[in-house]
Amino acid sequence: MHFLLATATLVASCNAFALPWDKRATDPSLPALPLEHFNTPKFARLLTLDQALSGQNASVTTIKPEDLPDAKSQTPTLVIPKNITLENITGAVEHAVDSLLEKRDTCSNVRVRVEWDSSSDNDKQGYINAIKCLMNKPPSGQFPVSKSRYDDLVGLHQTLTPNVHGNAKFLLWHRYYTWTFESMLRDECGLTGPLLWFDETRYAGNFAASSIFSSRWMGSINVGGNCVTDGQFANLALPYGPGSSNTPHCLARNNDDSKTINTGNSIVDACNSRSDYADMAACAEGGAHAWGHNGIGAVMSDVYASPGDPVFFLHHGFIDRNFRIWQNNGGNARLGYVDGTDSQGHALSLDMTVNVYGFRPDVRIRDILDTRGSTLCYKYNY
């Protein structure tokens, strides 16, 4: 009987143990890059609360129109493995999407994304272990710079940055990108607990007070642009960025409370008061989204390669949750409607494709508007 109890206790607590690192993932010898190196081209301007309240938005890119083609030309090219052709990718994606929609007309088991403070220690550790698992796995070969499967996600974001920032596709693409991340954690690394998100309104102006940024979990934020040397991502090696260049460096942060103060309820509510999708999305991008990135700073302030900091996905869970609240406030009408344009000036439509370069099947915008629909099948705990 004592043996059975001891075994049950061990099984119940096993998720509390941190996953060990593969040698690829960390490198204490890598330097922190000067902060000015992370001041890469931005595709949307920062919005103050007053600007958000007055109806302004961030749709005006900080890149001059004449410089945009040059910015795009510097973005790395996707490398497709030799055993895959564009023709069979298209066919496979079409078949996969059709099959998915046929087999899952309804979402019968909605997953709940849980806010960090509401999650158990076992769920926190399980989530971090799954991320470290991706960082330990070898890359797919799609992106030559990648050292791990997690790096592939960073390479994907870097490659598509000019297409999915500074336009109305921003919230939609990042919704599917974050879902792709979750799907990889579950399918490739066995995550069984919830995907976590960070309610930044609770720590606006004081991110360091969140246990996320502690030596127990994701490491310190008040490191003045230097390498994060504590927590479970200490000495993390990053091959991507800054910008569209790739200079190996460490995970660095540079907390700025004068910026994170702008992730509070006031600016979230101001953006969510907009009635048009594209107007709300532009406000959200330059509002809490941009202030959160720049407030954490260093790696997170680099638009292209910011997913190199694992906090990226906690942050984008927050942004997606705010988007979902805007949808909820408009009833079913906002689950079947978009407006605005993409990076090429094409009007968004419900049948426009959202792609993640084969990481997961291409979807249509209509497939991902309802997070509780058959494609995504998730909701937030509040």
For the regions a protein language model found, what residue spans apply to each?
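C-terminal accessory segments of proteins
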Residues: 17-382
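Cleavable N-terminal signal peptides of Sec/SRP-targeted secreted and luminal proteins
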Residues: 1-18
